[in-house]
Amino acid sequence: YGGIVPEVASREHLRVIIPVIQEALEEANCSLDDLEAIAATRGPGLTGALLVGYNTGKAIALSKKLPFLGVNHLEGHVRANWLVEETPPSFPALALVVSGGHTDLVFMEEDGKYERLGGTLDDAAGEAFDKVGRLLGLPFPGGPAVAKEALKGAVSSLKLPRSWLPGTANFSFSGLKTAVLHSIRKDSWSPEEIAWEFQESVVDVLAGKVEKFATELQAKEVLVAGGVASNQRLREELKSRITVPVRIPPPSLCTDNAAMIGAAASPRLSRGERTSLSEDVFSTNDWSVV
């Protein structure tokens, strides 16, 4: 389809949800009777797909009389950073959540406390990668395809815009996407050159914003999360620019996964928190729901 069709995605979730659960239990060498709690993504995201996983989780919790926790998908991405190092992050911390659907800058004064400083006003960074990949005739998903194409490129005469939005923690990538389209139509640069400069523009803005706010807020650590955090160029630039420790999960934990949802649910379970089975999914970006 060249992208995600919500109805198709929902039906595919429904088709594979039980086999995936069975496979996970087999790989972990356990059964549902060994579990102490159930956690499931509550949002944000595509409602049809969310409902499949969320309601399956609620059904298992109800049938096994287990505690249930609905998890904010974006918090899950941040908590993936707890899975890779023995020592927890230092606070206050600044988190960059950058994915196909979201690009948020979040301040964490303490563990579990989230303040969204800003986010994208239009396309998310990952969405921009996908759309530019499509413009360049690359396969979906565009993120890894554009990054691979950029490896063939180098500095050229092409200069794409950087949308800094001074004085804010917000991002905007729609203008950059339009500039790429105009560059393609001019037919003066190769796909590799365009991919390289596009990636440089995105990485420059993301790293620049993180550098600015990490300094201003005196963050002791920077946490990076989301599918775009798999981008090697972004990982290198953040670690090069930021003077405090930068945590980035391995690529396998940057893209959507269940481990990060468990990581987000675990401390809440320890605090005795529970999600009512009457609570529903949510589709919009809301950091107050954690």
Regions found by a protein language model. Give the residues of each.
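N-terminal beta-alpha supersecondary unit
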Residues: 1-44, 73, 77
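Glycine-rich phosphate-binding loop plus the immediately following alpha-helix
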Residues: 110-152, 177-178, 182-188
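Glycine-rich beta-strand-to-loop/alpha-helix junction loops that act as flexible
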Residues: 41-43, 60, 99, 223-231
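Conserved phosphate-binding catalytic cores of ATP/NTP-utilizing and phosphoryl-transfer enzymes
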Residues: 71-93, 264
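Conserved phosphate-binding/catalytic loops in two-lobed NTP-binding clefts
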Residues: 70-71, 222, 238-261
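Glycine-rich phosphate-binding/hydrolytic loop that grips phosphoryl groups
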Residues: 77-79, 249-289
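A contiguous, well-structured pocket-lining segment that forms one wall/lid of small-molecule binding clefts
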Residues: 31, 147-222, 231-241, 269-272, ...
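Short beta-strand scaffold segments in enzyme catalytic cores
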Residues: 95-97, 103-107
